[in-house]
Amino acid sequence: MFKKDLQGAPKQKLKSSAQRALRQSLLATYPLLTPHIEEILPKKGSLESMKLPDRNTLYVLDSVPLFYQNDGSDLLPHLKLVHRFPQAFPSIRIDRGAIRFVLSGATLMAPGLTSAGGRLPVDGGKPLEEGKEMEQGIVEDGRWSRELAKGEPVVIMAEGKEEACAVGTLAAGTDEVKAKGKGPVVEDAHFLGDGLWNLHTA
């Protein structure tokens, strides 16, 4: 999605009502951000939006990119936000062999997750339960503690690396990925070094 360098439009300050709506949407999608929300989106902060190509919008606070959105879909975290709060987002892990493909903007395929170096959520993990979101985070071995459904946002970690390398939306649920072991898993991801990562937001 952001393989090429980007030229963003001038930033526009969001109204207080729009900021409140985005804050609620962010917490609904990523409940584990709740303890950090005042740091990310302070109530008196000046959140700005920047229009990007292909109907994408980037949200910026004090020139720091926070999250982006494609044509009204779920808010997706910018990798710089993920690196600040890595355990607040659902994650999967690719093996070493898949890293160079993901960092070139290729579609993430299932074999990169089902191999020995890959990692998917805990087998049999329960779906997200309303009111119990805070209990469904990371377990001891670093796996996400619930299965993730098709269409959910996901952070992509990499074998042997501490920081996330990409963010995207699941083209298949994690239970399906385990069962089939093949096919596309994440398409059009935002990845380290892409146009969104390199975009000047000051």
Regions inferred by a protein language model and the residue ranges of each:
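Polybasic, low-complexity RNA-engagement segments
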Residues: 1-202
